[in-house]
Amino acid sequence: MENIQIKNFIYDIATGYIKSYSLKVILELEIPNKLKNECNGYNEHGLYVLLRTLSTMGIFKEDEEIDRLFSNTEISETLINDTDKYPWVNDSYFQVTLLPYFKHIEESLKTGKAMGTFNSGYNDGFDFIDKEKNLKKYFHNTLTEYTRTQIDSILEIVDFSNFKTIVDLGGSQGESIKKILDKYHLNNSIIEKGINYDLKEVIENNEKNYKDNRYFEIMGNFFTDETFPIGNCYLVKYIFHMFSDNQVLEILNKIYKSIKSSYQNEVCIYIFDHIIYKNKKSIPISIEYHTINILNGGKERTLNEWNNLIKLSNFKIDKVSSLPNILCSFIKLSLN
């Protein structure tokens, strides 16, 4: 790299907040939607600066002949308020709203605590999401979209047909359990129940139009409930990276307490989460690691860290495998 390239590279990182805040504003004001009609009600020069800035990145296009005239591009079209067509936009919107909390990086570094949310008046990241009602929808839609992008790969790798009761802990909108029940009908499996377990406010807002009578939703809380719904298969998707080692062990211990009197060696836990592989660079995982650390004190783990953590529980690791997308791996646990 030449000095000028290094300079430009560092400058691009240093000014990244401009891009993020600009994206945040156009999403909040639904500018891509309004460009389809008319974009009135804003200061003309301020709007021009915003659109001009984003047009240099390919978001919006400035007319070559008419001054201050902009139109949508293929990129900005995806930001039009149609999350059924482009559901990943939920995550982009959620991410850019987190910008203010990153000003506490230095204090988090010094204290080892999630100061981003604490200094902003929240107990933790979940308290933040719960109280910021406008963000809650985007957060849970993001979790559902993560599931949708991975569930087909999961169903190809994992055979769920021999489990009687499958419990998805923190299952959000129930996408995983529904997909499993859709694949394994009563005539080709022994599945009697598929339970989606999540917070009261999540379950209450879920759609109630799924018809399979094996599907159940149960309200609860990882840390205030003494036990969880009883099953012989548990799914824990994108959950453990949001918590500290002690919190993960608390959840695993509650699973053990829930099943120890009902099942012996039949129980499996499938953890779907990130594994940090040092020889593979993943910008999305690194960014998400930074985010959950600032918001909630969570952590991404290397394979060695996963091994050491599980050894402290009543379970053992049977299998570790990567899904086709490097962003997700699965760890299969059974009772010791």
From Swiss-Prot:
Domain of life: Eukaryota
UniProt binding sites for S-adenosyl-L-methionine: G170, D198, N221, F222, K237
InterPro entries with a match to the protein in the record: COMT-like (IPR016461), O_MeTrfase_dom (IPR001077), SAM-dependent_MTases_sf (IPR029063), WH-like_DNA-bd_sf (IPR036388), WH_DNA-bd_sf (IPR036390)
Catalytic activity: (3,5-dichloro-2,4,6-trihydroxyphenyl)hexan-1-one + S-adenosyl-L-methionine = 1-(3,5-dichloro-2,6-dihydroxy-4-methoxyphenyl)hexan-1-one + S-adenosyl-L-homocysteine + H(+)
Gene3D superfamilies assigned: Vaccinia Virus protein VP39, Winged helix-like DNA-binding domain superfamily/Winged helix DNA-binding domain
Assigned protein family: Belongs to the class I-like SAM-binding methyltransferase superfamily. Cation-independent O-methyltransferase family. COMT subfamily.
Name under which the protein is recorded: O-methyltransferase 2
